[in-house]
Regions:
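Bacterial Sec-dependent N-terminal signal peptides
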Residues: 1-33, 674
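N-terminal, intrinsically disordered low-complexity tails/presequences enriched in Lys/Ser/Pro
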Residues: 26-65, 130-144
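Amphipathic, charged-and-aliphatic alpha-helical interface segments
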Residues: 51-101, 120-125, 198
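Transmembrane beta-strand segments of Gram-negative outer membrane beta-barrel proteins
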Residues: 137-164, 180, 184-190, 227, ...
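Exposed, low-structure sequence patches enriched in small/polar residues
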Residues: 167-171, 276, 331-365, 372-674
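Outer-membrane beta-barrel proteins
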Residues: 193-211, 265-272, 326-329, 401-403, ...
């Protein structure tokens, strides 16, 4: 492809000088918390997680910040970028000096980095009043509660093959949500969601939308810390037996280790999978002693075996074709259990247990090696013990679990703050090949908490003011063959991330990652520069990826002779704020040899829609987001995104195939508050 060479040269020059051609008419920062958090996080952490759910939680927090002088440990530990030790330092400072007078006093706490302070300004404010408010009266809840109605419509300017023959619905995606809330005490809402291609108001969707979620949550009602009805998510312990909430990857664990792990969250997202339906509640028996109970009954999608059992539990949430609808709500699942945990002077210990059953037996195809130890039958149970300790220097956390398989899974980690600017984290996990839990989600290299032995060593270092260096090295060994393998495999994963902020406007960063797994070696490198003013911000980045697939039985010579797959991406993000209008734009040029050298990039999106996309092949991606706050009640956001490929005549395959080399979408979102 000769035509891309002049484009490459031009864009490379743009990268070298683009960050200098900026407006300097203002002072301050225009960076959003999403941009700041994306620079502290590892993009690939979000490939296998539902970032939308956690982003929604943080966005609501940013809209309703908390008084830092009155914030509880549990509230602060909800933030993914604060460690439990840092939370201890903040609370110790507030206690010692009788509260903060300004958010800038965070600079007096050595363990809080510059980037963390910038993020905290989005979620906290400082008020001298440190009194804890009593639960409001019903009259005040009704009178002073806040309402909001939201809607989103996505319009594609193209047709997929299934739109004309295959999908039973139209090509537009849309959703609606109503929510009522009173501070952090009461939250009530209902969501209706429709994916593109799903029938609206027809067939099984005679009530309109394909998916509805409803929820009611009451917090801080005397000894009742949390009462949640409807659809919700749970996170108990470190997730070895129960976590259908959000979890972070290997880089973010450096800050999230040991954070409050017994959480009940409402399921207010548009995702039609990975939620519980029923009731959950946490009650304080004694000071530091909490009891949680939960019950869930819900329908699930599944494919059936010839014997009528469940072959596979479907988690796509898509019901567009006759075949997909035939799998909809074909079975049911019941879950009941509880957790008890005790906290005192930095120590905590807890126990979790549950029983779950299916209306049809699980019958996986165990003739396939990687499914040899998959759960089978109707009824299952799991139990675990979690434990830990938090002080200024030490953070210790662990969980050990078992179940009706009789096998063991254990995860243990310890973090030590050698100085106020340097900390080490060591983590060990052993997940037996015979162990399973149908609701687990925890730290792992693989996709499941099963068949993995590993050790992880990470560090966080602030060598000087405005510097931040983080990194890790992780080793994992898989005894049993995985998908597409026939023997034991192992994985080495190393990452180094460096941030430098020479002044209040500039931020420079680089990230290096090297990974060997199942015969594939992948190296990734990123270099970026961010410049922020009061009304302007820009981020320029370059990504490079090289990947080599050697195969399980390749000799060393064959491995050395193998041609690597390479690729790069040049990206520019710009944002501008003027009174009631905020504009954000993103432009990317990518060129990779194949999917193995794909590259990930962040681009601005709508509310509750932090976007991390992957690109491979050759092409450009452009996105423009306009956000307008009209008065005190109406918010309108529009996003126009377009991808143009230079190396293909069509996009995707099957019913998702687009018969052109480009695709453009328009998304419109509106929120009315009163």
């Amino acid at each position: 492809m000769k035509h891309w060479q002049p484009i490459t040269q031009f864009l490379l020059k743009l990268f070298l000088v683009g960050s200098s051609l900026l407006f300097h008419a203002f002072s301050g920062s225009a960076q959003s918390w999403q941009q700041l958090l994306s620079e502290l996080s590892e993009t690939e952490d979000f490939e296998h997680t539902s970032w939308e759910d956690y982003e929604e939680d943080l966005e609501e927090w940013a809209q309703h910040p908390i008084n830092l002088n009155a914030a509880t440990r549990e509230e602060m530990e909800r933030l993914p970028f604060l460690t439990p030790s840092q939370v201890e330092d903040i609370q110790a400072y507030v206690y010692r000096y009788g509260g903060m007078k300004s958010i800038t006093e965070l600079t007096l706490i050595p363990s809080i980095s510059w980037y963390q302070r910038q993020l905290m300004e989005h979620f906290f404010y400082v008020d001298a009043d440190q009194k804890k408010s009593d639960f409001p009266s019903i009259r005040n809840i009704i009178k002073y509660g806040k309402h909001e109605a939201m809607g989103m419509l996505k319009v594609p300017f193209y047709e997929r093959k299934g739109d004309t023959n295959g999908y039973l619905g139209y090509k537009y995606k849309h959703w609606l949500r109503y929510q009522f809330r009173y501070g952090d005490y009461v939250k009530l809402g209902v969501v209706g969601s429709q994916d593109a291609g799903e029938p609206f108001g027809a067939g099984k969707n005679n009530l309109g939308y394909d998916f509805y979620s409803f929820y009611l949550q009451v917090k801080k009602l005397g000894r009742w810390k949390n009462i949640t009805l409807g659809r919700y998510r749970l996170h108990e312990g470190l997730g070895l037996i129960l976590n259908n909430d959000f979890s972070f990857g290997k880089l973010s664990v450096l800050s999230s280790l040991g954070s409050a792990s017994n959480r009940i969250r409402v399921h207010s997202s548009r995702s039609s999978v990975n939620y519980l339906q029923g009731a959950a509640a946490t009650y304080t028996l004694l000071k530091g002693l909490d009891l949680t109970a939960f019950f869930s009954y819900r329908k699930i999608d599944a494919t059936l075996s010839d014997q009528g059992g469940i072959r596979t539990i479907m988690k796509t949430g898509l019901h567009r074709t006759v075949k997909e609808i035939a799998k909809q709500n074909i079975a049911s699942n019941t879950l009941m259990g509880g957790n008890i945990n005790y906290r005192n002077q930095g120590w905590h210990v807890g126990a979790t247990g549950f029983y779950t059953s299916f209306s049809l037996p699980l019958t996986p195809n165990q003739s396939q090696l990687y499914k040899r130890f998959a759960p089978q039958g109707n009824n299952f149970w799991n139990a675990s013990v979690d434990y830990g300790y938090v002080s200024h220097r030490w953070t210790i956390a662990g969980e050990t679990a078992t179940g009706n398989s009789g096998a063991i899974a254990t995860l243990n980690a310890a973090s030590y703050l050698l100085t106020d600017h340097f900390s080490l984290l060591a983590l060990q996990r052993f997940y037996s090949a015979r162990y399973y839990s149908l609701f687990s989600n925890s730290f792992s290299e693989g996709s499941d908490v099963q068949d993995e032995n590993g050790a992880y060593l990470g560090f966080t270092w602030i060598p000087a003011h405005r510097w931040s260096i983080t990194g890790y090295s992780d080793f994992a060994y898989f005894v049993w063959p995985k998908y597409h393998t026939k023997q034991s495999t192992q994985c080495w994963d190393h990452l180094l991330n460096i941030l430098y902020q020479p002044n209040k406007r500039w931020t420079l960063g680089t990230r290096l990652r090297y990974k060997e797994k199942a015969g594939t070696t992948t190296g990734r490198w990123r270099l970026y520069a961010t410049f922020a003013e009061k009304n302007w911000s820009t981020k320029t980045s370059v990504d490079y990826t090289v990947s080599k697939e050697m195969g399980e039985k390749s000799s060393q010579k064959e491995a050395d002779d193998a041609n690597p797959s390479q690729g790069y991406l040049l990206n520019e993000n710009l944002s501008y704020r003027w009174h009631w209008l905020r504009l954000s734009g993103s432009f990317s040029y990518f060129h990779t040899q194949d999917f193995s050298s794909r590259i990930y990039a962040y681009e601005p999106g709508l509310l509750y829609q932090m976007s991390f996309s992957s690109f491979y092949g050759e092409g450009i991606r452009c996105a423009l987001v306009a956000r307008s706050e009209i008065g005190k009640h109406l918010l309108v956001i529009a996003k126009l995104g377009s991808t143009n490929y230079f190396d293909r005549s069509h996009i995707s395959t099957g019913l998702q195939e687009i018969a052109t080399s480009h695709q453009t979408d328009l998304e419109i979102q509106m929120k009315w508050k009163w």
